[in-house]
A protein has these predicted regions:
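Glycine-rich beta-strand-centered segment in the early N-terminal region that forms part
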Residues: 21-35, 46-96, 101, 147-151
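Cysteine-cluster motifs in flexible loop/terminal segments that predominantly coordinate metals
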Residues: 85-143
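Residues located in well-ordered beta-strands
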Residues: 2-4, 14-19, 31, 62-64, ...
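Residues in the short beta-alpha loop(s) of Rossmann-like NAD(P)-binding domains
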Residues: 9, 213, 280, 305
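Glycine-rich cofactor phosphate-binding loops and adjacent beta1-alpha1 units
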Residues: 175-179, 191, 201-202, 212, ...
């Protein structure tokens, strides 16, 4: 099969022929139909988050089941599925206490003594975040996918595999945004836009989108933002405090920078909560004024929207088909696998929301 392989940090992906194993007892072979090109992939490409190489990138996909292992009963050949990087074992402490997105059990992968899922001759190709979706086939644990209804368009379904679940889930689960509350979202990429859409679904009052790209701010309005702030033209913190008469109940950082994380904290009203969704580079320290804790302000992280994806993702599919979740506007362009490097380069400019690889092209 063809796959986009990362062999060295800060180098383009190479389209190569890679071999894939047969499904083990609890594994599922999936033929991707669509895969989103996510900004998170860039963090691993540029070395901000070190990863075992070579690897096949990609972690946001939807496809059709091709084959299942002998012990798999949840899906069968022909089922439509969304994949999820936060595969769960189902019996560790995180899983049994309801925190499935924090499961780190190695059993959702193959053990060192087993043959690798992906290889090129004698060379192991490491699987990326339990998935590796920039490939014509995926071999994954049965707990890394969820069945969906067949009338859901696959390119839209792919977005639910990461950006939508991460952004909407941060609003619903991590922060628990309440109706009528004021919200600010810093960064209007795929995840930030999903958080804005989620805040609108949750019934937030004022929803403030903060970015430096006019086209993204306009897109944010179509997804539910009531106000927009161009952070390149003003003091974003001051503007938010003036609009809200003292600060937001909830803020979301969706870029992954020290400065914007600190701004998310500064935009809070007393008692407010800042949720950091963005991937801050390893080794980066964030500075907060300690006295602010006396105002009962809170800051927290969010991993994949604190999801329970087998419950959440089918609901998000229904939200889309019922007109609540707006995914059509999120797709900037459909591309071929061979165009993945151009899509990743476009992400670096910050101009586009999402490129989606379509494997029938």
């Amino acid at each position: 099969m063809k796959a986009a392989v990362l062999r060295e940090a800060n180098t383009p992906l190479e389209i190569e022929e890679v071999s894939i194993s047969k499904p083990g007892p609890r594994e599922v072979l999936v033929r991707p139909v669509a895969a989103g090109v996510c900004h998170s992939d860039l963090h691993f490409m540029d070395g901000s988050y070190p990863y075992a190489l070579p690897t096949i990138l990609g972690h946001e996909s939807a496809g059709i089941v091709e084959e299942v292992g002998s012990d798999v009963t949840y899906v069968k050949k022909g089922d439509h599925v969304i994949t999820c990087l936060s595969a769960f074992c189902g019996h560790c402490d995180q899983c049994i206490t309801g925190h499935l997105s924090l499961c780190a059990s190695p059993e959702v992968g193959r053990m060192p003594e087993e043959a690798p899922r992906l290889h090129k001759g004698d060379e192991t190709i490491h699987q990326f975040l339990n998935l590796s979706s920039f490939a014509e086939l995926m071999l994954i644990h049965e707990h890394a996918l969820v069945k969906i209804r067949e009338d859901m368009p696959m390119d839209r379904a792919a977005l639910i595999g990461c950006s939508t679940t991460t952004g909407v889930g941060a609003v619903f689960h991590t922060a628990g945004v309440e109706p009528g509350s004021n919200v600010a979202v810093i960064g209007c990429g795929g995840v930030g836009l999903a958080a804005i859409n989620g805040a609108a679904i949750a019934g937030a009052g004022m929803i403030i989108a903060v970015d430096m790209v006019d086209s993204k701010l306009e897109l944010a309005k179509s997804l539910g933002a009531t106000h927009t702030i161009d952070a390149g033209q003003c003091d974003a913190v001051g503007e938010v405090k003036e609009l809200t008469q003292g600060g937001c109940h909830y803020t979301f950082e969706a870029i992954g920078l020290k400065a914007t994380t600190e701004q998310a904290w500064q935009m809070l009203r007393p008692g407010g909560a800042a949720t950091v969704i963005g991937m801050i580079p390893v080794g980066t320290m964030v500075e907060l004024h300690g006295v602010d804790f006396l105002a009962e302000k809170k800051i927290q992280g969010s991993n994949m929207g604190s999801n329970r994806f087998r419950v959440d993702m089918p609901r998000f599919v229904d939200f889309y088909l019922n007109g609540k979740l707006h995914l059509d506007q999120m797709i900037s362009k459909h591309i071929k696998l061979s165009e993945v490097n151009e899509a990743l380069a476009a992400l670096k400019t910050g101009q586009d929301a999402r490129h989606v690889i379509m494997f029938d092209q």
